[in-house]
């Protein structure tokens, strides 16, 4: 089946987000310039397709990736996982993580390892 332009755009957006996930500077401006659209356009499209703001969309993917690493990667520390997913501040990472998953990164790690 042919992909719709929305699907193609989402693929591009996901690719950019995944490639830059460890970069704290990843934001709507960077995303827009990488996919070649205006900031407003990217923001509106994401809102329409995911019901999230660009900021929340990026944050969600960061946290999903962090959760996957916490569950799987036995060699990485919580700090390393925070940095790997673009957080520069550990307490900010922990509070964002707790907000989404209802437990601290450490609790999550202990439950899944």
Regions found by a protein language model. Give the residues of each.
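Short, Lys/Arg-enriched, Trp-marked, Pro/Gly-tolerant hinge/linker segments that flank
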Residues: 1-11, 33, 48-56, 60
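Append "Primarily bacterial transcriptional regulators
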Residues: 29-37, 42, 46, 80-88, ...
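Terminal helix-turn-helix DNA-binding modules in bacterial transcription factors
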Residues: 48-88, 110-113
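…primarily DNA-binding HTH/wHTH and HhH modules…
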Residues: 95-113
